[in-house]
């Protein structure tokens, strides 16, 4: 079963801005020697961003020299926590994320903000000569992901996306078994996330912006709306302006392994069905129940999520089942096993009993992998920018099929459907502009 640790998905707040131009004069790309200190700055300190920073600080070569958040209370409390961890006062505290990126002493920027900010901040960091650890999902639209890949390539930056399961050894062991061919031909991959812990979000009235929060900069490129606590902090992910619901949250982690296991990046067609069936009257916009079928040449990937229900498939509340002719490999964050297929009572292969998760934890290993790649200037991280883009776009395809209610075909660039194609790119609120790379 998934522990509360797995659900650290609180909304991460943003750096506030003074200048209205989001980009910078190109910086000379920096390099970090094998024995050099690696100086990091974090944008978005509330939730997963701070967990990422803590993982960085477990490595002796890392020094945190800057924090940025639009919420004074969050910024000051995280600065105190960081000082307690390191024994040193954080040198620079910002409410303007662009000032952090413009700090020439910073080698690595951690982007821990809500999804709708990832593209602007990651591209600006690359342009300024920083390497980047960007939380998942990589982008909030398909076009944003394409732009981010081009930026990392253009500025030759080492980017790791926060899909830390890519560095978790038991997941890698499971994929090695899938790739061994012992399961036989795989006909479908069942991917599921049932989150019974997640409650209904009651409708709340709009209210004045709390003191110490720059809400206009929290919105950034998203549409202008009155302040509402339901659209802020952790629950931002249930609103289309800022994120894509459980599909782009847990879906990015789990569907990523469907792509990895099957050695694919994009489907031929997608269809989806679902809705707000568990909590029909709550404040959320994204579906609390969704089934999506991605069709490839000779197999399917099926996504199934439900909020407020904890019993999924194979006795688990999340995971994947690679369904082969000889057996099914089931994997989740607790471990993996193989269930044989039986014909006339005879097993087609030997069962593999549960192989439990092991090691120091995927997030710690993921950050170590990033640091090693930074030192060696190897852009092929465990969750490289390309890997992050593939799965972020894959998840977006499912959401677009749901929102249009259509079976869609996909050629890698377009649906060739006017209604569906309008979802390929987000419209940015002025004065923010989609980066041109």
What residue spans do the PLM features occupy?
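Structural recognition of the beta-strand scaffold that forms the well-ordered cores
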Residues: 40-43, 64-68, 110-112, 133-134, ...
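Extracellular/periplasmic catalytic domains that process cell-envelope and extracellular macromolecules
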Residues: 33-35, 102-103, 127, 152-154, ...
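N-terminal glycine-/serine-/threonine-rich beta1-alpha1-beta2 phosphate-ribose binding loop
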Residues: 1-134, 143-158
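A contiguous active-site-proximal alpha/beta segment in oxidoreductase catalytic domains
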Residues: 131-133, 139-212
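Alpha-helix capping and helix-loop boundary segments enriched in small/acidic/polar residues
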Residues: 69, 88, 112-116, 139-143, ...
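Contiguous beta-strand/loop segments that form the cofactor/metal-binding neighborhood of enzyme cores
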Residues: 173, 185, 190-192, 196-238, ...
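Short, solvent-exposed turn/loop segments enriched in Gly/Ser/Thr/Pro and often Arg
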Residues: 71-74, 94, 114-118, 138-140, ...
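Hydrophobic residues in alpha-helical segments
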Residues: 57, 101, 152, 178, ...
